[in-house]
Design a protein with these regions (language model features):
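N-terminal secretory signal peptides and thylakoid transit peptides that target proteins
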Residues: 1-13
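Conserved functional loop/turn residues at catalytic and ligand-binding sites
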Residues: 12, 29, 60, 65, ...
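N-terminal signal peptide c-region/cleavage motif recognized by signal peptidases
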Residues: 17-19
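An extracytoplasmic/periplasmic, membrane-proximal ligand-sensing/linker region
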Residues: 27-29, 211, 237, 259-320
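Hinge/capping helix and adjacent helix->loop/strand transition within the periplasmic-binding protein
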Residues: 80-86, 99-186, 235, 248-281
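Beta->alpha turn/N-cap motifs
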Residues: 90-95, 154, 184, 201-206, ...
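C-terminal lobe and pocket-closing loops
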Residues: 120, 206-274, 306
Length: 320
């Protein structure tokens, strides 16, 4: 895929072709596209960061939710916008590369330039507090013994959550009835209504429901435990082959955007993440706050590319 090389060529061409006016950027409000419905991990994180980011840049940052096709609808809004820095989008490797596969489109990472990582959020399997599954081993045992009877939701085809479910199935020789949604918000609502058995969700969007007692976490897809939820087993604790299933997501802009404007956006995002109120709230929600340079974000994307490559190689990652 050559993410790094394509990015450098695209950004280099943009700097030669367009006048870099970072000294006057921004001169109007910035649109921050969220490729999922309100209430999920992306939405919660972006809304927290947008306000202090706007203060730093001197212009308001307006959230624009564009759910659909596992994030592809939102990504299309970003890549079809002018390459002037006034439209940014929150995404991850899986949303930019894998989700388009499920939508029958080309991968979109080559059309985007990374600005900064925002957070890494643990991914959990959560269920209702009154669920028939007392623990993760009971759920996995049923998924193995009675293929297709356990319904598990995720925020959209090709998302990190979806990839984690597919990898769990492959590693443990299980079969779930997998149900995609247009974001975590609708999926959690369906879970609470009793329409599905469990949901793969980021801790940032599930934590309020866990704290209220409405949801119960069954397992953490990460390699490390969660300090605020020490009793939630990891994959290894549950007797499964361990892998990292957390979500590292950040801000992107069109690849042709001049580098000085990308750097100015980076300053705004990093300032937003370092805001004391924002960073405290994100940590309370279980996220690891990770302000970065564009180059550091590119390296993180390469690591995710290697992880997803295993599933592509064995044919486990394809439209269902």
């Amino acid at each position: 895929m050559g993410i790094g090389r394509r990015k450098l060529l695209a950004v280099g061409a943009a700097v030669l072709a367009l006048p870099a006016r970072a000294d006057t950027f921004p001169s109007k409000q910035i649109r921050w596209v969220i490729p999922f419905a309100p209430g999920g991990n992306y939405d919660v994180t972006s809304r927290l960061v947008a306000e202090p980011m706007g203060r730093t840049l001197g212009q308001s940052v307006v959230i624009d939710n564009r759910p659909g096709a596992g994030g592809v609808v939102g990504l299309e809004a970003a890549v079809n916008a002018p390459a002037d820095g006034y439209t940014i989008v929150m995404a991850s490797f899986t949303v930019g590369y894998v989700a388009p596969i499920f939508a029958g489109k080309q991968q979109m990472l080559q059309l985007l330039a990374p600005v900064s990582i925002l957070t890494t959020a643990p991914t959990l399997i959560v269920t209702r507090s009154d669920s028939r599954f007392p623990d993760i081993k009971t759920l996995l045992a049923e998924a193995g013994a009675r293929p297709g009877t356990v319904t598990i939701g995720h925020p959209g085809n090709g998302t990190t959550n979806h990839v984690a479910i597919l990898r769990l199935q492959l590693n443990e020789k299980l079969k779930f009835n997998i149900v995609p949604y247009r974001g975590s918000g609708p999926g959690i609502n369906d879970l609470l209504a009793g329409n599905i058995d469990c949901f793969a969700d980021q801790l940032t969007s599930s934590m309020p429901h866990i704290q209220s007692g409405k949801l119960r976490p069954l397992m953490n897809f990460g390699l490390q435990g969660i300090p605020d939820l020490p009793n939630v087993p990891t994959l290894k604790d549950a007797g499964c082959t361990p892998f990292e299933g957390g979500t590292t997501a950040g801000v992107f802009v069109r690849a042709e955007t001049p580098k000085p404007i990308v750097e100015r956006l980076n300053q705004g995002v990093v300032a937003g993440l370092k805001d004391e109120v924002v960073s405290k709230r994100l940590r309370e929600l279980g996220a690891i706050v990770r302000p970065s340079t564009p180059e550091q974000f590119t390296e993180a994307l390469k690591a995710d590319e290697a992880n997803v490559g295993e599933l592509l190689k064995v044919g486990a990652l394809k439209p269902e």
